[in-house]
């Protein structure tokens, strides 16, 4: 019975399904990407999801338009157990080592969420994103915000030691606004805007990792949807905000 309910929710109410079952910061990022793509979409758009996992972002963008062509790439996708979308005509996932050079064509939108901080050679990785983007196309990335991470780490005793292993850990603790500006300059891109994602108060930041897993995650998600917690999912730098209250930073570039 549970599996049947999950399939119904996934098919007809994907944003609700992921909002209740996934960590809210992940859902915040997906809704951020969904809104930016919806705002800039044209006819029959193509989307490349770099570091796609099991392709959950497909459910969000497919709800914008059924003419979207979605391709995801990630490490060893064939070994993943969650293959919810196999059989969809506009859905494709390819196994690629994201540390290497990969050529999967050019796309209108290249989306990569919380991936770049897992790789030592971030400049090479970003160059691959640019190579995969059509002229006048868009690159959208999200990554932990370094300044807020260090602030939270000081308050709550989080580790400030980067991982020594790529992929499984964060080899970089995060990025700053200047880092995202530099990516644009180094690759001759137009930086459209910088955003901050997942607003946190003292409670959410203190228990951030607990609220992302297991029973605590489900309870928090339910209360979130009931309106007990009210956080901004994302906000542009054009608005007056306290940046240190946001967990992730994001940018949209035009090629």
Please identify what each model-predicted range represents.
Residues 42, 120, 134:
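Short conserved AdoMet
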Residues 83-85, 150-155, 203-209:
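Short aromatic-enriched loop/helix-cap "lid" or pocket-rim segments at secondary-structure transitions
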Residues 113-116, 142:
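Residues lining the SAM
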Residues 162-179:
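Acceptor-substrate binding/catalytic loop of class I
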Residues 189-200:
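Conserved S-adenosyl-L-methionine
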């Amino acid at each position: 019975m549970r599996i049947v309910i999950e399939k119904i929710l996934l098919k007809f109410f994907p944003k609700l399904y992921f909002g209740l079952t996934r960590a809210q910061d992940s859902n915040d990022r997906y809704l951020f990407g969904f809104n930016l793509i919806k705002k800039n979409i044209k006819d029959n758009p193509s989307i490349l999801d770099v570091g796609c996992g099991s392709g959950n972002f497909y459910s969000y963008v497919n709800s914008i338009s059924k003419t979207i062509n979605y391709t995801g790439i990630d490490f060893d996708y064939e070994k993943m157990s969650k293959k919810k979308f196999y059989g969809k005509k506009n859905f494709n996932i390819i196994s690629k080592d994201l540390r290497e050079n990969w050529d999967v064509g050019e796309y209108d939108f290249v989306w990569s969420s919380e991936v770049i901080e897992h790789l030592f050679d971030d400049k090479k990785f970003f160059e691959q994103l640019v190579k995969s983007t059509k002229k006048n196309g868009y690159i959208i990335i999200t990554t932990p915000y370094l300044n807020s991470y260090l602030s939270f780490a000081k308050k709550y005793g989080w580790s400030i030691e980067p991982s020594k292993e790529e992929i499984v850990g964060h080899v970089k603790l995060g990025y700053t606004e200047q880092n995202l500006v530099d990516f644009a300059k180094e690759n001759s891109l137009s930086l459209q805007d910088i955003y901050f994602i997942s607003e946190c108060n003292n409670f959410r930041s203190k228990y951030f990792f607990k609220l992302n897993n297991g029973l605590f995650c489900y309870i928090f998600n339910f209360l979130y949807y009931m309106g007990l917690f009210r956080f901004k999912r994302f906000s542009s730098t054009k608005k007056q905000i306290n940046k240190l209250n946001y967990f992730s930073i994001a940018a949209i570039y035009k090629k």
